[in-house]
Amino acid sequence: MIFSEQILFSLGAEVLQYEVNELIFSDGQRPNYYYQVSMGAVKLTKDRENGTETILSIFLSGECFAETFLFDNKAYPFNAVAMELYKIFRVPGERFVYFAKNTQESLLKLYCYNADKLSFY
């Protein structure tokens, strides 16, 4: 788990539940939240002009996704979709960015997590 439940709740996290194939956020939407999987799996997808869907990445329990978009406020270039019955922590983006910028340990965790993700590509 990237950040403990205690830390997430101290930042105002909500726990949301999603059904299979339910959209969490869509391509073009601005980032407003930090997302961390509590239970289940989520996929990041890109819809193609020919009607097909490309899976870009899959995230499992304890992992966060699309967090880097909070730091530059660029729109998401993909969709996030629940793959199975799914619970997620959702933290308001401004609170999470403030926490990350002001807590050296949190930035180190994010850097290490992202470096680990990139090592699989």
Each PLM stretch: what is its role?
Residues 95-121:
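A small-molecule sensor/coupling module
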